[in-house]
């Protein structure tokens, strides 16, 4: 397992991994397997780490988007997210007697949206940034998965 955290991923391998992770996340969500989200998160971190290695950056930087999302969740809960989550649960169970402040709801959604936009931007940046030519401190350059003649 630890070998997944080492080495480099080129842009081609990165985008294939991103596509597979998105499909896996949708499939697991459709199957109501939310518990598998931790595994998907770990795979995102591994994908980001290997791509960061290709551009000469340390892998720990991949933890920043996850930390940002965690902070956004904590801010949301601190600002009244518990009633917000209770209201969502009530709506799912068709109990519409629980009301929350619109301002709190918009604030929580806004904080989460900022975190998601940052993760999206980070993912795109890693996918378009050129990797280091030749070997770097993380190993030799990655080979292309699909060879072009």
Residue ranges and their predicted role:
Residues 1-25, 40-60, 122-149:
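Membrane-interface extramembranous regions at the lipid-water interface
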Residues 17, 61-70:
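Central hydrophobic cores of alpha-helical transmembrane segments
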Residues 24-41, 68-119:
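Membrane-helix interface segments in multi-pass membrane proteins
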């Amino acid at each position: 397992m630890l070998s997944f955290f080492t080495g480099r991923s080129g842009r081609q391998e990165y985008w294939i991994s991103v596509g597979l992770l998105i499909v896996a996340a949708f499939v697991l969500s459709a199957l109501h397997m939310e518990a598998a989200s931790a595994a998907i998160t770990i795979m995102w971190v591994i994908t980001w780490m290997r791509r960061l290695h290709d551009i000469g950056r340390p892998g720990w930087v991949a933890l920043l988007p996850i930390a940002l999302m965690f902070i956004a969740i904590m801010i949301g809960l601190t600002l009244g997210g518990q009633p917000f989550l209770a209201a969502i649960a009530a709506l799912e169970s068709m109990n519409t007697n629980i009301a929350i402040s619109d301002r709190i709801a918009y604030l929580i959604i806004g904080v989460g949206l900022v975190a998601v936009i940052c993760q999206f931007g980070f993912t795109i940046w890693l996918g378009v940034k050129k990797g280091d030519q030749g070997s770097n401190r993380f190993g030799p350059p990655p080979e292309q998965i699909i060879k072009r003649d």
